[in-house]
């Protein structure tokens, strides 16, 4: 019993200080609440358009403090709080407040912005909602009269009366491009043709077969289809997929039709078995630069002569 009495005596000074601090805080809170109540009743603070979420939160906190104060009063008077209904109400209110905390965190930005707008009467300078498109910026700020108005102004100046321009919209004048002569020397042209011939030679069938012959990489087994046919089939499949997906028919140009006809005819021609001129650009073979690149034959177009049917003419005697 003596040990319990010593513990109680040690806690008495701390308890007295807590009660004094609590009394001071209660006095300040009471004065603040009375001041707010008076301002709300007088119409200084308009609460008609308030947030229902904050109102609910304030009501729950008020009920929580009431029940907590009632339990403290019961314990101060030395009564038992076992089976007191206030405990169940505290647990329920505490659970609801804990469930409202994530919602409060999500609405914190909107609530702070609305409270600031209600206090200051306007949004902040750095508010993202202020940075919106301004249609006035689309108007032209150039003050230059049109040609008609300038002409009328000159006529008025000659007569002694000058008219002010009514419109300040500048007319768009496209830039004038002066033709420039294309300087291309014969050496540059030959060099460009040789480079093109080298690219064609590197992608030729002869170089590809030599690479496959002396390479250590595993050989790819193909089902007897030529490279140009595989490339043609791939392009044709891509074309078909595009037409089916876009629901449109693609027209073939004359160049594409000629290339398709040439590719299909290469499978039945045996004249190019001993033709090695496609790698002459790599071996340094002699010849003109024009001969290194296969040229496309252009069909000559000319006016068609109308053929008249020959018939027997009657001779008049």
Curated annotation (Swiss-Prot):
Pfam family, one: Sas10_Utp3
Compartment annotation: Nucleus; Nucleus, Nucleolus; Chromosome, Centromere; Cytoplasm
GO cellular component: axon; chromosome, centromeric region; cytoplasm; dendrite; filopodium; nucleolus; small-subunit processome
Source organism superkingdom: Eukaryota
Acidic residues bias spans: 146-157
Entry keyword set: Cell projection, Centromere, Chromosome, Cytoplasm, Nucleus, Repressor, Translation regulation
InterPro entries per the UniProt record, alphabetical: Sas10/Utp3/C1D
UniProt region (Disordered), positions on chain: 125-170, 280-317
GO biological process: maturation of SSU-rRNA from tricistronic rRNA transcript (SSU-rRNA, 5.8S rRNA, LSU-rRNA); regulation of translation; ribosomal small subunit biogenesis
Chain intervals with Basic residues compositional bias: 297-317
Primary localisation category: nucleus
PANTHER family in UniProt: NEUROGUIDIN, SOMETHING ABOUT SILENCING PROTEIN 10-RELATED
Similarity comment: Belongs to the SAS10 family.
Oligomer and partners: Part of the small subunit (SSU) processome, composed of more than 70 proteins and the RNA chaperone small nucleolar RNA (snoRNA) U3.
Function noted in UniProt: Part of the small subunit (SSU) processome, first precursor of the small eukaryotic ribosomal subunit. During the assembly of the SSU processome in the nucleolus, many ribosome biogenesis factors, an RNA chaperone and ribosomal proteins associate with the nascent pre-rRNA and work in concert to generate RNA folding, modifications, rearrangements and cleavage as well as targeted degradation of pre-ribosomal RNA by the RNA exosome. Its dissociation from the complex determines the transition from state pre-A1 to state pre-A1*. May inhibit mRNA translation.
Protein known as: Neuroguidin-A
Species assigned in the record: Xenopus laevis
Gene giving rise to this polypeptide: ngdn-a
């Amino acid at each position: 019993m003596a040990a319990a009495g010593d513990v109680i005596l040690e806690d008495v000074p701390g308890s007295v200080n807590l009660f004094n601090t609590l009394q001071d805080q209660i006095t300040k809170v009471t004065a603040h609440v009375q001041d707010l109540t008076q301002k709300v009743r007088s119409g200084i603070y308009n609460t008609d358009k308030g947030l229902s979420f904050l109102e609910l939160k304030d009501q729950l906190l008020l009920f929580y403090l009431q029940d907590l104060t009632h339990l403290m009063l019961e314990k101060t008077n030395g009564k038992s709080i076992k089976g007191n209904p206030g405990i169940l109400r505290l647990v329920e209110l505490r659970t609801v407040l804990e469930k409202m905390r994530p919602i409060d965190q999500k609405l914190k930005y909107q609530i702070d912005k609305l409270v600031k707008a209600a206090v200051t009467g306007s949004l902040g300078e750095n508010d993202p909602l202020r940075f919106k498109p301004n249609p006035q910026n689309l108007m032209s700020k150039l003050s230059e009269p049109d040609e008609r108005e300038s002409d009328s102004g000159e006529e008025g100046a000659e007569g002694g009366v000058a008219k002010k321009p009514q419109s300040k919209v500048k007319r768009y004048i496209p830039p004038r491009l002066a033709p420039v002569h294309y300087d291309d020397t014969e050496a540059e042209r030959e060099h460009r043709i040789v480079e093109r011939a080298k690219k064609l030679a590197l992608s030729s069938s002869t170089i590809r077969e030599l690479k496959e012959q002396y390479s250590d990489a595993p050989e790819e087994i193909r089902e007897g289809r030529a490279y140009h046919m595989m490339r043609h089939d791939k392009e044709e499949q891509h074309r078909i997929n595009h037409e089916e997906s876009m629901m449109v028919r693609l027209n073939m140009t004359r160049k594409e039709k000629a290339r398709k006809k040439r590719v299909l005819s290469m499978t039945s021609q045996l004249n190019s078995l001993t033709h090695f001129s496609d790698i002459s650009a790599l071996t340094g073979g002699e010849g003109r630069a024009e001969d290194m690149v296969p040229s496309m034959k252009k069909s000559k177009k000319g006016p068609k002569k109308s053929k008249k049917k020959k018939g027997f003419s009657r001779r008049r005697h």
